A protein has these predicted regions:
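A conserved mid-domain beta-alpha-beta active-site/ligand-binding segment of alpha/beta enzyme cores
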Residues: 181-259
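Conserved small/polar residues in nucleotide/adenosyl-binding loops
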Residues: 264
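Positively charged, amphipathic N-terminal segments that serve as targeting/anchoring signals
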Residues: 1-155, 161-165
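Ser/Thr/Gly-rich flexible loops in soluble cytosolic domains mediating phosphotransfer, phosphorylation
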Residues: 147-153, 160-204
Length: 264
């Protein structure tokens, strides 16, 4: 289909497509959005030596470039949000500034203990709890949420609830598929966070690759192959098969298919 977007061949293409999809979604009035793609090359993603810090650092670099494109295309100011002050400080140290690009600024969604106005707020802040400690960024037009865990997602919901002007909120590489599976477990938010909040997040850009194995009754007995699920708003989700030279669309869907869509 000539109307189907081609999956990216490089990280630069991936970022460009994510920016295109986000700008189109914002222009269509979308408020809560999900952008998901591998922040590192496949071999690094699978490497056990790749730490959470490596992933967070890669996502910070990508989010700044992504936000830079949103600013250039829309003129809107973008606030990149981290769950807490320590995460913010690491990002500022890495990027060299809390305003790494014109129109792009880095912030903690949750205020520090020093900013607590009551002993109760200080107590809750110590354990990363209490909606009163969630801080908006008045000068921002768009929010990009980075490195939030499942336990920290209620803070993003609180931000979304407060924003009377309904500024766009983009959940950036948060692996929401995995996080949804943790809801309802001990020490995690209840499952209704999915229905109240996460279910409203529109996947405006989505790229997930997966390895598959096909068993045969005759030689070579086992065939390994790779596929991907890809979506660039406003187009449909595509199930793609890696032919070795390029990805070939196998099926399309208005709703996100399961990761097993390419199992034979």
């Amino acid at each position: 289909d000539d109307d189907l977007a081609d999956p990216p061949q490089t990280m630069a293409q991936c970022l460009q497509q994510a920016q295109d999809a986000t700008v189109a979604a914002i222009e269509d009035g979308q408020i809560l959005m999900d952008v998901e793609f591998p922040p590192l090359a496949a071999d690094l993603m699978d490497d056990p030596n790749t730490s959470a810090g490596d992933m967070a650092g890669a996502n910070t670099r990508l989010a700044i470039k992504y936000a830079q494109g949103i600013v250039a295309r829309t003129g809107k100011k973008v606030a990149i949000l981290y769950p807490d002050v320590p995460e913010l400080e690491r990002a500022v140290e890495q990027s060299g500034s809390n305003t790494p690009q014109p129109g792009v600024s880095l912030h903690s969604l949750r205020a520090s203990i020093a900013e607590a106005e009551t002993p109760q707020q200080a107590f809750f802040a110590l354990f990363g709890k209490g909606k009163e400690m969630v801080r908006e960024v008045p000068e921002a037009d768009v929010y990009v949420g980075l490195t939030f865990s499942a336990q920290e997602l209620p803070d993003v919901e609180e931000l979304d609830t407060r924003e009377s002007s309904k500024k766009p909120i983009i959940l950036f590489n948060l692996k929401l598929d995995t996080q949804r599976g943790d809801l309802g477990l001990p020490a995690f938010p209840p499952k209704d966070l999915q229905w109240r909040f996460l279910s409203r997040a529109k996947a405006v850009y989505f790229l997930r690759t997966r390895q598959y194995t096909l068993s045969l009754p005759e030689p070579p007995f086992v065939v390994n192959y790779q596929g991907a699920i890809f979506r660039q708003y406003p187009g449909p989700f595509q199930c793609l098969l890696d032919t070795g030279k390029a990805f070939r669309p196998v099926s399309t869907s208005a709703r996100r298919p399961a990761l097993g869509c390419l199992l034979y």
